[in-house]
């Protein structure tokens, strides 16, 4: 699981919003997407125990 990898997050988010085009809010959406992927990643690594992480 390489959500933590910034390049992976970037391409994942760009793929997710590829139909969005170059509109200014698309860039914001992509940035937000990258941030949330990285946050998920940080939470996962900080809870390095083997317990399943459940969404809040």
Swiss-Prot record:
Iron-sulfur listed as a keyword: no
Stored InterPro entries: Attractin (IPR012529), Attractin_sf (IPR036585)
UniProt-listed GO biological process terms: sexual reproduction
Glycan attachment residues as annotated in the record: 25
GO CC annotation, single: extracellular region
Tissue distribution: Produced by the albumen gland of the egg cordons.
Location of the protein in the cell: Secreted
GO MF terms, alphabetically ordered: mating pheromone activity
Keywords: Disulfide bond, Glycoprotein, Pheromone, Secreted
Pfam families: Attractin
Annotated S-S bridges: 4-41, 13-33, 20-26
TM region positions: none
Keyword DNA-binding carried by entry: no
Protein task: Water-borne pheromone that attract the marine mollusk Aplysia into breeding aggregations and coordinate male and female reproductive behavior within the aggregation.
Protein's name according to its UniProt entry: Attractin
Gene it is expressed from: ATT
């Amino acid at each position: 699981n390489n959500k933590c990898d910034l390049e992976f997050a970037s391409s994942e988010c760009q793929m997710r919003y590829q139909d969005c085009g170059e509109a200014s809010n698309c860039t914001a959406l992509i940035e937000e997407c990258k941030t949330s992927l990285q946050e998920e990643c940080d939470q996962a690594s900080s809870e390095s125990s083997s317990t399943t992480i459940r969404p809040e």
